[in-house]
Amino acid sequence: MKLLIHSAQESPIVPLENNNINVIHKDNLDIDQIPNYLYNEIECYDYLEYTEDETLDKLLAKISSKGTLKLKGVDIYQASRNFADGNLTTVDMSKAIANGKRRCFSVHELSEIISSKNCSIVFAGISGLNYMIEAQKND
């Protein structure tokens, strides 16, 4: 089974025939109510930035052995670089890094944190302002 957590107003488009994907808005998710090891894949779009510090550990606990965690969010260094270069207005920068978020990440720091939690980084990269990380649990 797969869990897809998003923060957008509209849900992502998921194939209708694939009923093994649970799509949940970040505001409707109670991570503590999900049994551990339930999902073989969890995908998060702009989710970690809105959460408490221990949420990454809780997400990893919900993934089965050798399962996958995919994360996407705004990379603070990319946003800062684009702002400093004049490619982002103050309003756009505020939307990218603030907008109700509790914290910011960079692809490098988040990759190191995930690696320290018994996971292998399969992919880590940047596209525009966004980081993308795919990790696999080693247990």
In which residue ranges do the predicted regions lie?
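Hydrophobic adenine-recognition pocket in adenosine-nucleotide-binding enzymes
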Residues: 47-48, 73
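Short alpha-helix
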Residues: 98-118
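A short glycine-rich, Lys/Arg-flanked "PGG" loop and its adjoining helix->strand segment in the class I
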Residues: 53-68
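A short acidic, Gly/Pro-enriched loop at the edge of an enzyme's catalytic core
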Residues: 29-45
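Short, glycine-/aromatic-enriched active-site segment of Class I SAM-dependent methyltransferases
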Residues: 82-100
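Conserved beta-strand signature within the Rossmann-like core of class I S-adenosyl-L-methionine
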Residues: 66-78
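Core SAM-dependent methyltransferase catalytic element
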Residues: 2, 117-139
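Class I SAM-dependent methyltransferase SAM/SAH-binding core
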Residues: 1-34
